[in-house]
């Protein structure tokens, strides 16, 4: 015989059921999402030798592509490129458009909204001058009459604001545009990491001096990822970055794609 429930008991049961229904389901972690979909989505920026796309096939190549493909292989999933820019790649991570982004400097502003693993490698910051323009220190560029091109939304702009805040900045969407600004005389110089600077100099013989301004700027480059409570992906990427650096795989990949881009004039003091 079923016992009768008192009105108080009925109310209590209903309240408990409502409370359970109100508890949101736990958000799926990025790691679990990648495993479920079988896809690791990565941001691909038009910035050789990190990433560059074959105009005929549409296929992305570059050392950062090879790195992501190795990460995907270790995870047992497929690497899927998602075209982005330096100005939008952090937003793409936040909005779940991509799962990771190679080639990011961990600036304080970025660290407020995303997490990082690494460093994956380290980079010097170079300037490539217009022919006829001479400069060798950051102070030489730190003048209002000196126009310096840099990529919009990139760490190049952040660094330029620190080392040459008085320079007149010419902010453009990609490295090809910054190089064109210098060769055309719209800018006196361009500033970017050594990899992009080497490729730009090789592809544009009309560019002038390739300069490592002093004091030297040498910064680590990280893998950016979405901020979340579950840090499984972050821990995995941290281990992956350390392992590949210790065994020399990272430097070998970078030099391989510099060579394929024809940028063989790497200064002896440059290490990645």
Regions found by a protein language model. Give the residues of each.
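Ligand-binding clefts/hinges and TM-proximal coupling segments of bilobed small-molecule sensing domains
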Residues: 29, 155-172, 209, 241-272
């Amino acid at each position: 015989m079923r016992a009768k429930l008192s009105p108080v008991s009925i109310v209590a049961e209903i309240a408990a059921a409502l409370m359970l229904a109100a508890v949101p389901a736990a958000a799926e972690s990025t790691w679990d999402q990648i495993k479920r979909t079988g896809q690791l989505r990565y941001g691909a920026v038009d910035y050789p030798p990190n990433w560059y796309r074959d105009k005929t096939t549409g296929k992305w190549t570059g050392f950062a592509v090879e790195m992501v493909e190795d990460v995907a292989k270790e995870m047992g999933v497929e690497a899927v490129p998602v075209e982005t820019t330096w100005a939008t790649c952090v937003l793409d991570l936040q909005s779940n458009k991509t799962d990771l982004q190679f080639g990011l400097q961990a600036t304080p502003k970025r660290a407020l909204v995303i997490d990082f693993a690494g460093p994956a490698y380290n980079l010097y910051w170079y300037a490539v001058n217009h022919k006829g323009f001479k400069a060798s220190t950051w102070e030489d560029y730190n003048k209002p009459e000196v126009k310096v091109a840099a990529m919009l939304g990139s760490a190049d702009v952040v660094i330029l604001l620190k080392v040459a805040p008085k320079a007149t900045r010419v902010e453009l969407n990609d490295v090809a545009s910054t190089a064109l600004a210098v060769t055309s005389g719209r800018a006196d110089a361009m500033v970017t990491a050594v990899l992009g600077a080497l490729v730009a100099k090789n592809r544009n013989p009309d560019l002038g001096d390739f300069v490592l301004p002093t004091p030297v700027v040498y910064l680590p480059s990280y893998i950016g990822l979405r901020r979340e409570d579950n840090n499984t992906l972050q821990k995995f990427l941290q281990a992956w970055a350390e392992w590949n650096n210790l065994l020399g795989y990272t430097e070998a990949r970078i030099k391989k794609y510099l060579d394929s881009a024809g940028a063989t004039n790497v200064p002896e003091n440059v290490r990645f």
